Curated annotation (Swiss-Prot):
This is UvrABC system protein B. Its main location: cytoplasm. The keyword 4Fe-4S does not apply. It comes from Symbiobacterium thermophilum (strain DSM 24528 / JCM 14929 / IAM 14863 / T). Residues 25-414 form the Helicase ATP-binding domain.
Length: 659
C-alpha cells in the first residue's frame, strides 16, 4: 500500500505543529470527535493534510457546497500528488425534482441535466475505495444521498486476469449486464468495442485511459492500458477489474426478486387506494409502475429507478439507504469543513426530501417504498461516523456540546504573522458621515472596504448616498447570480470600485487581502446576522490585511457583540505574543487576482462583452464550446475553474428556457 505523503514547499509553522500533533494523537488514541478551532487564514487545510499523513486513514472531507469542495479538492491534490484525491458531488448541473402540487393539480416531471464529467469523478471515487487505502474523497452533502449497494458494485465488477481461461463472449455479456454498451465507432466512457480477439473497454471512472484485452483461443493472453485518443499503449497489467457503469446495478437474481417485491407492494397499495375510493390515484399508480417494471425487465433500468432502490438492494421498509459512507472501510476518518454550516445542512436534508415524497405517494405517482430513496437521517449519519474532526473558526453548539475542552484544538497564529483586526464600537449618531471619512482614508491608501447592513433598503440607500458623494461603490444582494458575484469580487480586488455594501457578506466567503476595513451597521440589533458566530465570521473578513480594522456602529454593546469582541481580542493577544517572541512583522497576504471569466475567454472574445448577454438563438453554440472548456479544466484538475464554467452554462440554459 502506498502511504499518504504530503508534498509542500513549506513546513508547519505558528500554531500548526501543535495542532497537527494533538489531532493526530487524538485519532491514534481512538478519540471519536475532535474540533480544530482555526482562525481565518491560519492554514487549516494544510494542518488536516498533515494529520492525514500522520494517521494514514482513508478520509472523507465534507464541505457545504460544490465550489468549496472543488477548492478543497484542488488543495489536497497539490498536497498529495502521489495519492488518490477524489471529488464526489451531485452530478446534476440542473435538477428539478419530481413533484405534485395538489392545489393546482400540477405534476412536475423530474428534469435533470447530468454532468458526465462529474459522474466519471464519482465512479473514480468509489472505485478508488475498493482498490487502495490511500484515498481522500472531498464531497458535498450529496454523499449522504442514496447510492447502490457497495457489495453489488464490488461483486459485479468484471475481473480480467492474464492466463485465465474464459470465453470472450461470456465477458461481453457480463459487460452488458453491468450497463456498458457496445459501440465500435464512438469509443467513449461506459462503452466497449470488439475487433476479432481484441476487446477494448473504456471504464466508468476513466478520462484518458482505456483497457485492451487480447485473447488466444479462450485464454486471456495480454492486458494493456492505452490512450483512447492516440491509441498509444501506456502500460501492461496482469489483472484489472472493470466496475459497473452505474452505482444502481444489481445481479439478475436480485433484479428478479426485486421485480416480484415491487409487484407485491403495488397490489397491496392498489387495494388501499381503492378501499379509500381513490380510483384515479390507483389507475395512475398501476399504469406508471407497470411501465417501469416492463422497462426494468427489458433493459435492466428505467427512468427514476432510484425510487425502487429499497427493493433492488433488498432492504426492509424504513431501513437507511446505502450511501458513499458505506463504501469506506471500517477504519476511516471524517473531516467536516466549516462544521457550523455543514452540520445543520446535513441535519436538514431528510425533512425537505420527505415532505415532497409524501405528496407523490398520497396522490398515486409513487409507491410508498419511494420514501426510502432518501438522504440519511441525521441520527443515521451520526451512527456511521468512525472518527471525526470538526473544522471551523466558529464551531456550532452541536460540536461544542459533544467535544470535551481537552479535544478542542486551537489554531490561532497565522503563518504570515497577521493579527485578528482591531474592533472598535462607535455610536450610530452621525455614523454615515463617520463611515464616509473612514472610506476616504482607506481609498487614499488604495485599500478596500466592506460594509454590512441589516436590510436590503438600508443597503440600497447607503449605496446611492455614497455614489452621490463620489465614492466608487457597489451593492451585492442575494439575487446576484454566482458568476456576477465572482465578477464583483474580482472588480473590488482590482480597484474598479472601492466599497462593497451587502447584507450577508460572510456567506460569500469573501477572503480579500485588499480589504482593510469592515464596517458593521446596526451591530446591536440581535438576530442571526448579528449573533456572536456571524460577527466573528464577519470580523474575519479584515484578517488578511496588516492594517485590518472593524468598526461596529451601535448604541449599546449586546452580549453577542461583547463575546465576539472578547474572542477577537483574545486571539489577537495570542498572535501578538507569538510575533514578539519570534520577531515576526505581519505582512498583508499577496494573492494574485484571477480572472473569473478566464475560463470562457475564447468564447467571450467571439461573442458579446458579457457572455451572459448572449442572444437566445446563439446559446446552444456557446454552451457547446463552454462544455469543451469545462471538460478540459476538469481534466487539468482545475475543479474551481470547471465549476465556474458549469455555473455559466447553467445560467445560459436557464436564460434559454426563460426565452
Amino acid at each position: 500500500m502506498k502511504p499518504f505523503k504530503v508534498v509542500a514547499p513549506f513546513e508547519p509553522t505558528g500554531d500548526q505543529p501543535q495542532a497537527i500533533e494533538r489531532l493526530s494523537e487524538g485519532v491514534r488514541r481512538g478519540a471519536r470527535e475532535q474540533i480544530l478551532l482555526g482562525a481565518t487564514g491560519t492554514g487549516k487545510t494544510f494542518t488536516i493534510a498533515k494529520v492525514i499523513e500522520q494517521v494514514q486513514k482513508p478520509t472523507l472531507v465534507l464541505a457545504h457546497n460544490k465550489i468549496l469542495a472543488a477548492q478543497l479538492c484542488s488543495e489536497f491534490q497539490q498536497f498529495f500528488p502521489e495519492n488518490a484525491v477524489e471529488y464526489f458531488v451531485s452530478y446534476y448541473d440542473y435538477y428539478q425534482p419530481e413533484a405534485y402540487i395538489p392545489t393546482t393539480d400540477t405534476y412536475i416531471e423530474k428534469d435533470a441535466l447530468i454532468n458526465d464529467e462529474i459522474d466519471k469523478l464519482r465512479h473514480s471515487a468509489t472505485m478508488a475505495l475498493f482498490e487502495r487505502r490511500d484515498v481522500i474523497i472531498v464531497a458535498s452533502v450529496s454523499c449522504i444521498y442514496g447510492l447502490g449497494s457497495p457489495e453489488d458494485y464490488r461483486d459485479l465488477a468484471v475481473s480480467l486476469r492474464v492466463g485465465n481461461q474464459v470465453d470472450r463472449d461470456y465477458i461481453l455479456r457480463r459487460l452488458v449486464d453491468i450497463q456498458y454498451e457496445r459501440n465500435d465507432h464512438n469509443f467513449v466512457r461506459n462503452k466497449f468495442r470488439v475487433r476479432g480477439d481484441v476487446v477494448e473497454i473504456f471504464p466508468a471512472g476513466a478520462t484518458d485511459r482505456a483497457i485492451r484485452c487480447e485473447w488466444w483461443g479462450d485464454e486471456i493472453e495480454r492486458i494493456s492500458e492505452f490512450d483512447p485518443l492516440t491509441g498509444e499503449i501506456t502500460g501492461t497489467m496482469t489483472h484489472v477489474a472493470i466496475y459497473p457503469a452505474s452505482h444502481y446495478v444489481v445481479a439478475d437474481e436480485k433484479r428478479e426478486q426485486a421485480l416480484r417485491s415491487i409487484e407485491e407492494e403495488l397490489e397491496e397499495r392498489l387495494k388501499e387506494l381503492r378501499a379509500q375510493g381513490k380510483l384515479l390515484e390507483a389507475q395512475r399508480l398501476e399504469q406508471r409502475t407497470r411501465n417501469d417494471l416492463e422497462m426494468i425487465r427489458e433493459i435492466g433500468f428505467c427512468s427514476g429507478i432510484e425510487n425502487y432502490s429499497r427493493h433492488l438492494t433488498g432492504r426492509k421498509p424504513g431501513e437507511p439507504p446505502y450511501t458513499l459512507l458505506d463504501f469506506f472501510p471500517d477504519d476511516w476518518l471524517l473531516v467536516i469543513d466549516e462544521s457550523h454550516v455543514t452540520i445543520p445542512q446535513v441535519a436538514a436534508m431528510y425533512n425537505g426530501d420527505r415532505s415532497r415524497k409524501e405528496t407523490l405517494i398520497e396522490y398515486g405517482f409513487r409507491l410508498p417504498s419511494a420514501a426510502d430513496n432518501r438522504p440519511l437521517k441525521f441520527a443515521e449519519f451520526e451512527e456511521r461516523i468512525n472518527q471525526v474532526i470538526y473544522v471551523s473558526a466558529t464551531p456550532g453548539p452541536y460540536e461544542l456540546e459533544r467535544v470535551p475542552p481537552s479535544l478542542v484544538v486551537e489554531q490561532i497564529v497565522r503563518p504570515t504573522g497577521l493579527l485578528d483586526p482591531e474592533v472598535e464600537v462607535r455610536p450610530t449618531k452621525g455614523q454615515i458621515d463617520d463611515l464616509y471619512a473612514e472610506i476616504r482614508a482607506r481609498v487614499k491608501k488604495n485599500q478596500r472596504v466592506l460594509v454590512t447592513t441589516l436590510t436590503k433598503r438600508m443597503a440600497e440607500d447607503l449605496t446611492e448616498y455614497l455614489k452621490e458623494l463620489g465614492v466608487k461603490v457597489r451593492y451585492m444582494h442575494s439575487d446576484v447570480e454566482t458568476i456576477e458575484r465572482m465578477q464583483i469580487v474580482r472588480d473590488l480586488r482590482l480597484g474598479v470600485f472601492d466599497v462593497l455594501v451587502g447584507i450577508n457578506l460572510l456567506r460569500e466567503g469573501l477572503d480579500i487581502p485588499e480589504v482593510s476595513l469592515v464596517a458593521i451597521l446596526d451591530a446591536d440589533k440581535e438576530g442571526f446576522l448579528r449573533a456572536e458566530r456571524s460577527l466573528i465570521q464577519t470580523i474575519g473578513r479584515a484578517a488578511r490585511n496588516a492594517e485590518g480594522k472593524v468598526i461596529m456602529y451601535a448604541d449599546r454593546i449586546t452580549q453577542s457583540m461583547q463575546k465576539a469582541i472578547n474572542e477577537t481580542n483574545r486571539r489577537r493577544a495570542i498572535q501578538e505574543a507569538y510575533n514578539r517572541k519570534h520577531g515576526i512583522v505581519p505582512k498583508t497576504i499577496v494573492k494574485p487576482v484571477r480572472d473569473v471569466i478566464q475560463a470562457v475567454k475564447p468564447v467571450a472574445e467571439a461573442g458579446p462583452a458579457n457572455i451572459l448577454d448572449t442572444p437566445p438563438h446563439e446559446i446552444p453554440k456557446v454552451v457547446a464550446k463552454l462544455r469543451k472548456e469545462m471538460m478540459q479544466a476538469a481534466k487539468d484538475l482545475d475543479f474551481e475553474r470547471a465549476a465556474e464554467i458549469r455555473d455559466i452554462i447553467f445560467e445560459l440554459e436557464k436564460k434559454k428556457r426563460g426565452a
